């Protein structure tokens, strides 16, 4: 199987070839880094967002825009499926890299994380790479300057001209879609925090309602988080014993956190907009199901909260 960055690079090539149709802008910085703007200075599109999410997964998962259930406050949902959950979600999609520079900040995800392999997480999951090319996704409102791109390239041990960065703010079509496409990823991350053996997970399927695109990032952060916290519905196929699933299961969905129950913007404001003060156990889907492929047992934990979603999606 091709390496994560190699797979993502091929997807970027195809995306760049259809830039006009996708509503994106492709450019090169002075240092040589290729920038694919999916929503900073260009409107982007639904398809650009779907492909952005696909690249976040290094192509190891399928991303669909689908219809929602009748009790959802929105008509569309983002569905994700992967048969390589650790590589796709944890080694690539998880936004584990804080990218910083002079007057610049972004949350970094994508397979460049496996190229840099600087996070403690990789000691547990492996999947480090020594790539010839690297691909990253930046959640930010600014396009990265040369200095930031050069720094990323150095950490990935490549030259800047071998780096591709896709950029979209939260309050953009593409940015909203790629965040809502993290239903399975947030489940795996929560399980890792709880000490569950991720190698037991065979595959994952998830969906979350696609909220209206907001006109500012703070509103967008609230809506996209709520989409997963209160509308995320994930099913994991797993191996091993059922007793451990029954024991850990109640701690997996978002309602295991005392912060659960109100729109995320309210929770965020309560903690003075400091993510690190929010209970980390909040960040997981509303409903999580396990299907044991060895015993045939099914376990379900949590519940959806369409009333909270409706309140969140209506707020401006």
Where are these regions (language model features)?
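Anaerobic metallocofactor- and corrinoid-dependent redox/one-carbon enzyme cores
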Residues: 1-156, 161-185, 189, 193-316
């Amino acid at each position: 199987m091709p390496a994560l960055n190699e797979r993502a690079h091929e997807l970027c090539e195809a995306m760049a070839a259809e830039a006009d149709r996708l509503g994106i802008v492709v450019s090169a910085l002075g240092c040589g880094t290729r920038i694919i703007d999916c929503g900073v200075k260009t409107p982007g599109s639904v398809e650009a967002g779907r492909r952005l999410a696909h690249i976040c997964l290094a192509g190891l998962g399928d991303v669909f825009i689908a219809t929602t259930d009748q009790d959802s406050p929105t008509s569309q949902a983002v569905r994700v499926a992967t048969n390589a959950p650790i590589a796709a979600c944890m080694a690539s999609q998880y936004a584990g890299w804080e990218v910083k520079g002079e007057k610049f900040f972004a949350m970094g995800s994508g397979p460049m994380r496996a190229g840099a392999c600087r996070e403690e997480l990789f000691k547990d999951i492996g999947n480090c790479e020594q790539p010839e090319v690297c691909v990253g996704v930046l959640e930010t409102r600014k396009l990265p300057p040369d200095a930031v791109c050069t720094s990323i390239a150095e950490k990935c041990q490549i030259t800047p001209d071998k780096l591709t960065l896709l950029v979209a703010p939260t309050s953009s079509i593409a940015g909203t879609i790629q965040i809502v496409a993290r239903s399975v990823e947030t489940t795996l991350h929560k399980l890792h925090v709880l000490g569950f053996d991720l190698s037991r997970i065979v595959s994952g399927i998830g969906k979350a309602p696609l909220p209206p695109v907001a006109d500012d990032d703070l509103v967008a952060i609230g809506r996209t988080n709520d989409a997963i916290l209160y509308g995320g519905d994930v099913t994991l196929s797993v191996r091993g014993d059922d007793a451990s699933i029954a024991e850990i299961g109640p701690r997996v969905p978002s309602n295991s956190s005392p912060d659960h129950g109100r729109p995320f913007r309210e929770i965020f404001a309560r903690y003075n907009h400091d993510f690190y003060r929010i209970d980390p156990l909040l960040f997981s889907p509303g409903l999580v199901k396990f299907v044991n492929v060895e015993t045939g047992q099914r376990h379900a934990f949590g519940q959806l909260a369409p009333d909270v979603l409706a309140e969140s999606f209506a707020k401006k």
